Amino acid sequence: MAASAGPEIERLIALLSKLPGLGPRSGRRAALALLKKRDTLLAPLATAMAEAQAKVRTCGTCGSLDVTDPCAVCADGSRDGRLLCVVEEVGSVWAMERGGSFKGRYHVLGGLLSALDGIGPEALRIGELVGRVADGSVAEVILALPATVDGQTTAHYIADRLAKTNVPVTMLARGVPVGGDLDWLDDGTIAQALRARRPA
């Protein structure tokens, strides 16, 4: 960091550098851009962040983010509650909704099982998922997890946990590239993967 930067600027750079995809250099560039455009960018961003901090909450049903609890998807009576799509993170819900192909409900795990990172089933919302399926209203669980080692491990674990419920567990077809995340897929690929899902 530049010696001429005061502690306020250094703190801004340090915080921006913690965002996904940003490091110290890009955090510094982002901080400079914000400070250059205080009225048109920094002030509105600060307001939006304060509003998000105050109003956005986690949906108690699915784990997504919204300003209401339950979220808009869970509260929408026109959605097919028999279809439950399990995703890793909220970004995947947004990707699925952007595509407009899925009309069921979601369950956000909050991560994936990972032996390397020490993330076990208790750290995820798998128990809540089992509870939602066990209540008898779900007719199919669709696993829309990344085609990575951790994603596949999580999918197999969930399929095993749900085996006794006799509810079919399917996975998105391989239109999702290996190593790919839903956040990065185009709408057509997501729609095709949904149509071609298969048993887990």
UniProtKB/Swiss-Prot annotation:
CDD domains: TOPRIM_recR. One of its GO terms (molecular function) is zinc ion binding. GO terms for biological process: DNA recombination; DNA repair. A zinc finger (C4-type) spans 59-74. Residues 82-177 form the Toprim domain. Pfam families: RecR_C (PF21175), RecR_HhH (PF21176), RecR_ZnF (PF02132), Toprim_4 (PF13662). Keywords: DNA damage, DNA recombination, DNA repair, Metal-binding, Zinc, Zinc-finger. May play a role in DNA repair. It seems to be involved in an RecBC-independent recombinational process of DNA repair. It may act with RecF and RecO. Belongs to the RecR family. This is Recombination protein RecR. The lineage of its organism: Bacteria, Pseudomonadati, Pseudomonadota, Alphaproteobacteria, Caulobacterales. The gene is recR.
